[in-house]
Amino acid sequence: AQCEATVESNDAMQYNVKEIVVDKSCKQFTMHLKHVGKMAKVAMGHNLVLTKDADKQAVATDGMGAGLAQDYVKAGDTRVIAHTKVIGGGESDSVTFDVSKIAAGENYAYFCSFPGHWAMMKGTLKLGS
């Protein structure tokens, strides 16, 4: 099974992957984020935050208040299944989570919680059959 996925982000606030299906035989799953743009993280930083789809907007809103030093993720937010750090152009980061944290039939979303990005920079994640 392919127990990882790579998502590229750019200076135009886009992810190149809109859907990730996690093979249910995977015990752990790794999400790799690459910033293929040129801009610095203070201006055009991106991260990858995984939550239930229903929690996406609230987590993004709370994350804005956390600031760049906290990677725009509220400390101790139990709605966050996994997240990368905020990266700038030419950088990359990865995060691994236990597949037991996601359930079949539930809709999950991954998004960038950098202020103003989440509405455009998002995708769906689900457990495969």
Curated annotation (Swiss-Prot):
Pfam families: Copper-bind
SUPFAM superfamilies attached to this UniProt entry: Cupredoxins
Keyword hit for Chloroplast: no
Primary site of residence: periplasm
Keywords: Copper, Disulfide bond, Electron transport, Metal-binding, Periplasm, Transport
Domain Plastocyanin-like positions: 1-129
GO cellular component terms given for this protein: periplasmic space
A GO molecular function held by the record: copper ion binding
Localization: Periplasm
CDD domains: Azurin
InterPro entries: Azurin, BlueCu_1, BlueCu_1_BS, Cu-binding_ET, Cupredoxin
Disulfide bonds: C3-C26
Residues annotated as binding Cu cation: H46, C112, H117, M121
General function of this protein: Transfers electrons from cytochrome c551 to cytochrome oxidase.
PANTHER family: AURACYANIN-B, OUTER MEMBRANE PROTEIN H.8
Protein name as catalogued: Azurin-2
Organism, as annotated: Alcaligenes xylosoxydans xylosoxydans (Achromobacter xylosoxidans)
